[in-house]
Curated annotation (Swiss-Prot):
Protein name: 3-methyl-2-oxobutanoate hydroxymethyltransferase
Quaternary organization: Homodecamer; pentamer of dimers.
Keyword terms: Cytoplasm, Magnesium, Metal-binding, Pantothenate biosynthesis, Transferase
UniProt-listed SUPFAM superfamilies: Phosphoenolpyruvate/pyruvate domain
Record text on cofactor binding: Binds 1 Mg(2+) ion per subunit.
Highest taxon listed in the record's lineage: Bacteria
Gene Ontology biological-process annotations: pantothenate biosynthetic process
Cofactor: Mg(2+)
EC number: 2.1.2.11
Database matches in CDD domains: KPHMT-like
Residues at the active site: E181 (proton acceptor)
A GO term, aspect molecular function: magnesium ion binding
Amino acid sequence: MKTKTDFLKMKEQGEPITMLTAYDYPSAKLAEEAEVDMILVGDSLGMVVLGYDSTVPVTVEDMIHHTKAVRRGAKETFIVTDMPFMSYHVSPQDTMVNARRIVQESGAHALKVEGAGEVISTIHYLTSAGIPVVAHLGLTPQSVGVLGGYKVQGKDAESAKKLIEDAKRCEEAGAIALVLECVPMQLAEFISKQLTIPTIGIGAGQKVDGQVLVYHDLISYGVNRVPKFVKQYTFVQEEIVRGISQYVTEVKTGQFPEEKHSFTMKEEECLALYGGKQ
């Protein structure tokens, strides 16, 4: 299993880091089989798995439950788990309780937190206690209400400078990596060159140290629309619907199950059961 030390070496050597979300045993198992470097158990599970309109309703218990399943499916892959909405915007003591629960109960190797400001002290607090933390800047889904929706961040010089400073502060606070979401590629490249820790982009262009996508977006599974920055590599949703539709048709028309899908009794046992009469 790769560790944070390996990810630092990958950045130094210019080897791109691959990260993918996973939310359950089968998706994690497939991600590991495909040799993904890092798995993110994102609170995006609230939208793509649980059917919420945002990530806000996701709880610590949800993250623990899903991370445990991912851990069972990907025992040899570095796993990062999101701290959900308001689980770290509380007192330092309560933040530590939530962080400890996720790490101890789920088996996550690192936690991810969104934003800067007061979150910088949270990063320092958690890393000082020995909990690896991945920072997340740019578009931060837990704060879309404040940001005015799902919009590109850092498009003007003033906001770009703030993101640069926030990124540096995240590294200084002890973050082991930084996710940059929906920021101009020029800004993402500049930030990546300023930091010694790896940057993982999602909608941040090519010049970052790695990429992350949502599992369901990448394979077109249960999604109707995807963001501009997503490339869909396969379309399993179409195959799944086709297969289920065929099943429904065959049951309705009596084509399924066939004899080969059924079990039988010996003739003498049938006679003993109902005398050969039905």
